[in-house]
Amino acid sequence: MSKFQNYYNNDDNVINYPYIDYIIKSYIPEYYVDTNRRKYVDMHIFEEAMLHVSTIYEESDKTYERLEYLGDAIFHMIITEYFYHRYNEENEGFLTRLRIRIERGDSMVELSKNLGLNNFVQIYGISLNDHILEDIFESFIGAFYLNFGMKYTRLFIIKLIEKHKNLSELIAYDDNYKDLLLRYFHQMKWGHPKYIEEIVIDPKNNQRNKFISKVKNPFDKVIGIGSASTKKKSEQLASQMALTNLGVIIDGEIDTDWINKIEKIETEATQTEIKDKKPMSVFNPNNKLLSKNTIKNLLLQYNTKLPTIDIDLKLFYEAMTHRSYLIRKNLPNRDVPKSKSIVRLQKKSNERLQFLGDAVIHFIIGEYLFNKYADSGEGYLTRLRCKLENSESLFFLAKQSDISSYLLISQNIEVLHGRENVNIIGGGLEAFVGALYLNIGLGTVKQFLLEIMRIELDINQIAENETNYKDLILQLYNKNKWGHPVYKILKEEGPDHCKIFTMGLYLGNKLMGIGKASSKKKAEQIASKKMYQNYINN
């Protein structure tokens, strides 16, 4: 008999309070002695977390997808912070690899089964599979957070991991293509692989998104492409193609001698650099240190008031230190600073704080969009979050807030326009957020980040641009059994190099919307928007 047998009814298997009570007593018994705890559990949220899209009967029916979106962001941040503290001497590459292994699909499925969630999944007309179990785990975390808050969700996840995961085995485990590509980039000192996601409606199933991932090298060249039903899998496939193109995978097998090959390439590149480049001092006269007043004023600029807590300047110095400005042994005489005002080399780079700050930003934006767009689906929320948290947006925010001017970078990086480098400057903002989170707490970070986005980014316009009205029209036609939407060219104007297209959207023979733009696709979007808004308004 299953240990969860007493907590579900074999007729409908609906998740229930006795099961939640069992989970609390098993993982966070301290919750019941907390006098400030919430006095009731909203079981409707947990029930929603178990509803697969196949159970939809009416348009108003809910599924677990929004809670899955929220749970993904929560789990990601808590695991990131946990590893950051537990492995406080390890570098960002190690932490990233370990986190990837915990967040893998098979790992999530295992955790879902450890909790017995497979007993409560509501599906119709299909068989329970690992993909659903992976989703259900994240949606359960989302529901848990909405009921019990961050404090107890963090405690629950940490105890769950410590009970069911052998971290030593995960550290030794290394067959992950994304891991290997990250190691390759680190060996080449290329920073991080840049993944670009595109989300489209899967033509085989209009209810699900299809992810297309492209991975780029530091020279902005696409080196791998992957397509799958989940973002993680598409990134794995893109990484596999990249490793093949880079010569790490040969005839489908990983070349065991690849690290030696990288080191050889690296040595040759270093020797060429020494021959070709004029030596330059690492010390950068343009660098400047953050002060407590600068940090306070920066926060006040974005309507964020500091609580009565001492600012840990060492932590913020670390957050602003690019790896090019670290202490190194045996500096040549030319590298001795000529002025006492020049900022000294630092002991730690900001890479660990970037690792943490990235996850904090991911969570804050995810939760904000979840609440702001309460009627929007997981696909839309994911696309919008990607726009707000991508490196270009973070770079823009760092420049607008002037955080970029406090990055400590070597003179060589400065000359190479390092303060205009999207990854370096965007990473600086991530690290600043990580330091702010550790020093002051989530509430202040949330207030700062949401205010800087509100003031510097037009979120409503970004959201409007992200709305794919052609997808909405397709769903509308499918729901009403109207067949397929038909777009026709009504008019073409102007010379070939500067054409203006007028497109019409038809339902049968009836013209439902007209759009005019410099491309057919844009005109179709405008026509779709007009029809959709007319349908909603009427």
Swiss-Prot record:
Domain DRBM, residue spans: 408-477
Enzyme category, top tier: hydrolase
InterPro entries to which the protein is assigned, alphabetical: dsRBD_dom, RNase_III, RNase_III_dom, RNase_III_sf
EC number: 3.1.26.3
Record Pfam families: dsrm, Ribonucleas_3_3, Ribonuclease_3
Domain RNase III: 24-149, 238-381
Keywords: Endonuclease, Hydrolase, Nuclease, Repeat, RNA-binding
Superkingdom: Viruses
Catalysed reactions, as listed in the record: Endonucleolytic cleavage to 5'-phosphomonoester
An individual GO BP term: rRNA processing
Gene Ontology MF terms in the entry: double-stranded RNA binding; ribonuclease III activity
Database matches in PANTHER family: RIBONUCLEASE 3, RIBONUCLEASE III
Family statement: Belongs to the ribonuclease III family.
Biological role: Digests double-stranded RNA.
Name under which the protein is recorded: Probable ribonuclease 3
